[in-house]
Structures are given as C-alpha cells and as structure tokens.
C-alpha cells in the first residue's frame, strides 16, 4: 500500500507540477470618481528601472500579470486625459497581490505634467506575520548584519534570540531556521554546527516569516526564510568584488557576476571566509576557536518563448572549524575539530498555459557530510562521529485563477537516506554510551490544496488543507487545515489579520538515528524512551498592521501554540554532538511589535525597531530521543534553555547622496535566558556602529569603503547554559574592521 501511494504520487507529479517564486498581480484602473478606465497602459518595472512586462487594461479596467518574480517594483500607469500614476511596492514570493490604481483627470487649463506617486506600505492581503527584504534593502545594511543567515535573522526577525551552542530560537522552538529556496524546502537545519550555510549575498528577496503559513510552506514553524535567488539577467554584465577584514582573524573575500547571452541568463558567486571566534566559546576568552569555509553558487535561467522558463540553481559549501576549549582542556592540548560539506541542486521548469493557469515542476537534491574529528591529547574525552545525508525530491504545483480565486494544488515527494556513526570514550567521565553505526532510508509524501480569495470587499481569506505522510525513524500521518484572514480598513489604512495552522513536523534529521538508538539502547534503563517522534501543533495568531505615514508602518502580533512531542537539542556529555529530544507537551505564547521606516528620501533616514515578549514551557515526561541524566516525571514543567522573556533589536541609518556617505547603528537587547533549576542569566545590551562612503566612481564602476565596530562596549555576555554539565556559552567580543567593495 505504501509503495502504491508513493508511485501514484510520483506519476501525478510527472504530469502535474514548484512554482519558482512566481506570483500573479492583478488590479483595476479607475478615476477619482470610481469609474472604469479602459485602455490604460500599465508597465511593470523593477526598482532599477528595467521594464518587466507591459499590458493594457481591458474593457472593465482590469489588468493582470500572470507570473512575476518576487522583488521591488514600480507600476507605471498612463491613459489619455489622465495624469500618469507611479506605484511602488514589494512583491512577496507566492502571495498574489491585488491593486486598485486611481488616475486623476487632467485639468484643461493646466499645462504641466503631474505624476502621482504612491507606495504600498501595509499589505492589505497579508494574513500572517512576515517581513520581506529585497536586494536593495540588503545592500543598504552593514556587512556584519548580512554575513550569514543567522546574523540576518538575529537582527531582523522579531523574537529571534541566541540559544546555546550557536543555535537560534524563534517563537518557542530551537529548530527554527528553515530555508525555502526558490520554492523548495529541506529538512536540514542551517545552524553552523550542522551546515556551512548560504550567503545572503545571493538573495534577490528574503521573506522572514514567523506565523500564518499557507499549506504550500509545509510543516515548518518558528522561522522560515522564503528565499528567491539572484538572476544574471538582472545584473546585465555587472558584478562585485568585496573584501572585508576585522580583528579576531575575521576575513571574507567574495565576488559575483551575472549577465545574459541570448536567452540564457547566468549568475556566479564565490566566497571564502575565516574567523578566530567561529563558535560561541565556553568562556569569555576564546581558545581553539578558529574556523574557515567557502561557498559557491551558480544559477542559469533560460526562457523559451513566452510560455516556458527553466532555472538551474547549484550551491556548494564547506567549513572546517575547531571545537572551542575551556582553559583546563587547552592546557593539555585538546584539539577536536569538525568538517562540514554540503551540495544542493534545484532544477525548475515553469510553463504558462494562459494568463490564468501556470504549471511548474522542481527536481531537487542535497547531499552532505559531517565529520567530528577526535582530539589527539591523552586525557580529555574522545568523541568521533559522522553523518552522510542524502535528499532527493520532486515538488509540484498547479496554479489557476478563477473568478477572483487564486487556486493552487501541489505535492511534494522526498526520498531520504541517513547514515550516521558515533563513538565516545569519556576517559573517566561517568557517562557511558554504546558505539553506533547505521543507516536508514525513508521519505515523505505530501499533498495540499489552497485558495486565496476575497469573499467581499476588504476581506482576504487564505484557506487550505495539507496531508503529510512521513517515514524515517518514526512513521506518522496527519491532515492539517490552515486558515488565515485579513480585513483592510481602507480609511485608516489598517489591517487586522488572524490565522490558525495545524502542523505536523518531522523530527530534526541531524543525528536522529543516533538519538533513537540511544532511546532504545541506553545503558541506563530510565533513558530508554524510544524513537525521536514527530511534533504536532495547534498554532493561533492575531495581529494588527497600521500605516502611520507613507513608508512607515507599525505591526503588532500575538501568538499561542501548543503541541505534543516538542523538540530541543541535547548534547551527549561534552562530545559536541547535538541530538534531538522530545518532551511530552509544549506551550508557547508571546507578542511582537515592529516599527518599520523605509528610507525617507527627503531626510535620508531609515530605521527599524522590534520588541518581542515570549514565554515557553515544556512538560514531562521525555518521550523520545536522548533523555540524558535529567528525567522528568509526567506533568513536570520546565523552561527550556533558549527561553528569553524580552528581546529587542533596533537599527537606524542615515544616507546622503553626496559621495554615497552613510552611517548608522544596530542595537540588540535580551533579558537573559534561563539556567535549569536556577536563575536567569544577566540581561545584556550591545550596539554596533558602521559608516561608509564612495572612494571612487566612473560609472558604472565605483569603489566603496565601509568601517564597522561590532559590540562597541565589548559586552561579552553569557548566552545560555543547556544543562548542568555543559558550560555557559559567551557572546562575541568587540571587533573593528572595514571593507572595500568594487562594483563593475
């Protein structure tokens, strides 16, 4: 039966359809009295001025662009007898957008040409909480904020906070950074302990999503990075070479280039980096903490006629880094290391049958390796581990527009292979673990259907359902309904939104076989709690978005989620091997406030302020994975190590067109995480300063300089303590550095 189900899904996938981040835009052209304006010329331009598409409004004043990639755009509208209109907006991946453009009649005695300009500050159809950043937004940020996805999320995603051992927590979960790349998601976690990561420099857009996920986003929760990658066709034969250097051996050299040859667009990116404080160390002064890595990306886009688009994305990376020591281990020469490798390929095909119907297919693959190398000293504990994962999949969607309904149905078929090994010699440590080596094959089959529509004026509904079957170390099946509502108060420029999501989340794939092995064969009988289990959740969210002024918005969100078999990371003794653990139940609730001010051209000022209030509880007993030496009785409540009640971030920047001068600051505050059965760690506040200007220019070439100071006051605060036997980790110390960026 299982084989028949998978085969039938696969055959449907071959004849059915992942949308390559293509989004429809529709709207109506009216005059200021509400009358239809037919025959208006409507052109869609990218932020840099390239015309993407141009159409004419029909007899009822309607226009529609069937497939548009996410990004920043300007919609230019002109009609005889009317002043022109210019409308700026940012298009999210996979969210249809409806607009009403109002044109003003020309006065017969007035000879001057007037163009009405406006912008989309608050999206009236957004039913969840998300924050999109375009390539132009990312280019305006200082380098330390965009070094990695962790840096980006820590500063720009509401409620994100550091957890122990370089993990990040978002909305009550430690496995919280899930990448959705060109419509494809993977089970792999992006934290530096598991992955060399993806550079934000290859992003065309990134949508930082924290709640209200439609069925196509699968069963990711907490924090999702919906990423669209850069296309060479947009670079038009231009590129960059960037070098950054800072104290603590922080160096980064990267370059990119893109262009178009006939119908083929091409984009290349390479990056090499080092750091003398690669991981968060177990004491204020880092010891044996050097890391280095490299990443490369290539993307090819080919358009065949007006109906077919092919895209091939290739990514590869690796990192070698030392496992930081405490002073006692450093003195005896402990030298454990870790090596990570990862390669990804995504081939996508989009076919347009008509302006109303799109069909698309994505084939994807990811392979990698993780090797934990032992220390050569004779005294400290020895840990040896390896992991070789493989993911193969096909993700398919069919999109159709019908009488105001944006319908989408799809499936996702994934084949997984996981090979793991582990050996630990405590050398006097009281913990004893049996050696392990094994492999397992499994997979996931998912189907979904969803609708985005407006039942009546100013109300938008996202309605859908998803079915998932997952089989690896554990088998589970669930049907998950999703609903989101958004009501637009036109007069006050406000949006009230609410969402309910049911989730079915596979266990973290990293060392899940090892965790399940220990769950069955632990030396101590009370640690035999079985396989790592799937996490099921009910998720509720309500929010308010308000336009305070053009390009200035205020958003307030509140959420509650409860679930069974919640996840957390747990380290095996002091092996630096982190395996998943399940708790019987979890409850997390909180609120977030975001004040966003996009750059005001008149003043050259942009800024962003975020505050999050949250509380998370886990309830015993431990129900799967590696239980450790701290068992919980049924109903016993604990606060996880990543829980931080108050979190705040702020960025403020000033840009001046003269000489390309800019300056700004990024600040972060945290009230402190919890120590198990003890007090909270002290609160902390850090600030970064940055400035830059153009050294030389000869269009289109120019050379830019940037100067940065991170953690200005050198506040090396305590981040988190995962358990009694694991040391506290400490935040990065102050760095002083700069960069040169050559654009050609």
What are these regions (language model features)?
Residues 20-124:
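Periplasm-facing N-terminal accessory domains of Gram-negative outer-membrane beta-barrel systems
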Residues 58, 82-83, 87-102, 111-214, ...:
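Periplasmic N-terminal accessory/gating domains of Gram-negative outer-membrane beta-barrel systems
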Residues 245-274, 284-321, 337-359, 401-403, ...:
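Transmembrane beta-barrel wall of Gram-negative outer-membrane proteins
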Residues 297-299, 391-397, 435-448, 529, ...:
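Outer membrane beta-barrel strand-and-loop segments of large Gram-negative receptors
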Residues 301-319, 339-474, 595, 608:
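Face-selective signature of the C-terminal outer-membrane beta-barrel domain
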Residues 301-303, 637-744:
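Conserved C-terminal beta-signal and adjacent last beta-strands/turns
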Residues 318-320, 326-327, 369-371, 419-427, ...:
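Surface-exposed extracellular loop regions of Gram-negative outer-membrane beta-barrel proteins
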Residues 454-460, 558-562, 581-673:
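Gram-negative outer-membrane beta-barrel transporters
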């Amino acid at each position: 039966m299982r084989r028949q189900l998978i085969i039938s899904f696969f055959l449907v996938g071959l004849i059915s359809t992942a949308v390559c981040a293509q989004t429809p835009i529709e709207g109506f052209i009216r005059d200021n009295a509400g009358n239809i304006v037919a025959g208006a010329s409507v052109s869609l331009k990218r932020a840099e001025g390239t015309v993407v598409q141009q159409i004419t409004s029909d007899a009822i004043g309607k226009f529609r662009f069937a497939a548009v990639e996410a990004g920043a755009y300007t919609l230019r509208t002109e009609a005889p007898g009317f002043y022109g209109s210019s409308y700026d907006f940012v298009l999210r991946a996979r969210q249809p957008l409806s607009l009403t453009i109002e044109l003003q009649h020309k006065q017969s005695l007035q000879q001057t040409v007037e163009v009405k300009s406006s912008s989309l500050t608050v999206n009236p159809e957004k039913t969840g909480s998300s924050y999109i950043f375009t390539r132009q937004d990312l280019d305006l940020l200082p380098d330390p904020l965009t070094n990695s996805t962790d840096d980006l999320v820590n500063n720009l995603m509401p409620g994100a906070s550091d957890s122990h051992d370089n993990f990040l927590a978002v909305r009550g979960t430690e496995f919280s950074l899930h990448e959705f790349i060109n419509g494809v998601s993977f089970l792999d976690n992006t934290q530096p302990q598991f992955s060399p990561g993806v550079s934000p420099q290859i992003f065309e857009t990134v949508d930082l999503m924290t709640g209200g996920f439609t069925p196509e986003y699968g069963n990711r929760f907490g924090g999702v990075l919906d990423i669209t990658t850069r296309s060479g066709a947009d670079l038009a034969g231009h590129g960059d070479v960037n070098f950054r250097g800072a104290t603590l051996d922080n160096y980064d050299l990267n370059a990119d280039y893109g262009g178009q040859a006939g119908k083929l667009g091409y984009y290349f990116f390479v990056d090499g980096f080092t750091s003398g404080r690669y991981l968060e160390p177990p004491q204020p002064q880092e010891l044996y903490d050097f890391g280095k890595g490299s990443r490369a990306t290539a993307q090819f886009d080919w358009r065949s006629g007006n109906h077919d688009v092919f895209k091939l994305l290739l990514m590869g990376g690796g990192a070698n880094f030392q496992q930081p020591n405490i002073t006692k281990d450093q003195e005896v020469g402990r030298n454990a290391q870790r090596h990570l490798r990862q390669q990804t390929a995504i081939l996508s095909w989009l076919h347009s049958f008509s302006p109303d119907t799109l069909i698309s297919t994505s084939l994807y693959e990811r392979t990698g390796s993780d090797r934990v190398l032992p220390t050569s000293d004779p005294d400290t504990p020895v840990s040896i581990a390896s992991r070789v994962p493989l993911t193969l999949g096909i993700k398919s969607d069919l999109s159709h527009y019908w009488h105001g309904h944006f319908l989408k149905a799809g499936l996702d078929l994934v084949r997984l292979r996981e090979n793991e090994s582990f050996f630990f010699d405590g050398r006097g440590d009281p913990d004893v673990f049996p050696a392990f080596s094994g492999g397992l094959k499994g997979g996931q089959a998912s189907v979904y259907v969803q609708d985005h529509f407006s039942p009546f004026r100013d109300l938008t509904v996202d309605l859908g359902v998803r079915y998932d079957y997952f089989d690896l170390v554990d088998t589970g099946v669930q049907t998950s309904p999703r609903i989101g509502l958004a009501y637009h108060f036109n007069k006050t420029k406000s949006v009230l939104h609410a969402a309910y999501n049911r989730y079915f989340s596979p266990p973290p794939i990293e060392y899940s076989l090892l965790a399940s092995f220990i769950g069955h064969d632990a030396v101590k009988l009370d640690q035999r709690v079985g396989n790592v289990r799937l996490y099921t959740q009910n998720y509720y969210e309500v929010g308010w978005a308000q336009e305070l002024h053009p390009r200035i918005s205020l958003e307030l969100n509140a959420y509650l989620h409860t679930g069974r078999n919640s996840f957390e990371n747990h380290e095996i003794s002091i092996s630096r091997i982190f395996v998943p653990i399940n708790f019987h139940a979890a409850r997390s609730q909180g609120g977030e406030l975001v004040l966003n001010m996009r750059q005001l051209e008149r003043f050259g000022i942009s800024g962003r302020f975020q505050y999050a209030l949250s509380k998370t509880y886990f309830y015993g007993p431990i129900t799967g994975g590696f239980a450790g030496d701290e068992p919980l009785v049924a109903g016993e409540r604990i606060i996880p190590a990543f829980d931080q009640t108050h979190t705040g971030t702020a960025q403020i920047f000033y840009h001046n067109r003269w000489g390309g001068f800019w300056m700004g600051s990024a600040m972060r505050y945290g009230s402190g995480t919890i120590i198990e059965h003890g007090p909270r760690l002290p609160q902390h506040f850090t600030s970064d300063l940055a400035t830059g200007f153009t050294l030389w220019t000869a269009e289109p070439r120019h050379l830019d300089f940037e100067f940065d100071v991170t953690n200005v006051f050198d506040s090396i605060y305590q981040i988190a303590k995962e358990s009694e036997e694991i040391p506290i980790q400490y935040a990065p110390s102050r760095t002083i550095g700069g960069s040169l960026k050559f654009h050609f």
